Amino acid sequence: KVVRSQIADSPIATITGLSGSLLWTGNQGEIVFDMHVGRELTGGTIEGLAPCSWFELQFKDGSKVTISGTSMLTFADIGQKKLRLKQGAFTADVVPQPVGKPMIIQTPSTVIEVVGTRFEVEALQAFTTVNVREGNVRLKHLVDGNAVDIPANYRVIAEAGGDLSPMLLPAAENYWKSQLDVQAGGFGKWLPATKKRPA
């Protein structure tokens, strides 16, 4: 017979990348500042303590999640991955999840269900932004219970009283041109191009 506390103490993920000031608090209250790539973690809470902090975690099934900046993420996997992004920036590349057991990500204002996709989340107290790169994500607004499916290449900004309609993600710029006619050692301010002058 497997006892639930034994499951909770088993490693569920491995650190695959990190930088900056970070703090991990394990399920049993263990606090660790000295983390390294390759360390296996049970569930717990990871905190990015500085704007330059980032942390990447890979679950046993190959799904990867990353937090960056001043962020706080609690994670567990007892047959289903459940994460709580209290604040900050979060990206995920999720392999297909078992039927009926999507990855659940809760922010202060939303619940996001993921069955397998690549997406980003920014969670603040007042709103949550979800950008979907591949696959689909289901977002439920906690304030009013409204839900929306977000397809690939779309985003939703969920805020109190706001519209949950998906918006097309802006296309990435692949080409630009600049003209820097400044003497060596000179400084200037970038200005966008107008009809009368180049950028």
Segments from the language model and where they lie:
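Short acidic/polar, Gly/Pro-enriched loop/turn segments located at secondary-structure boundaries
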Residues: 1-129, 134-199
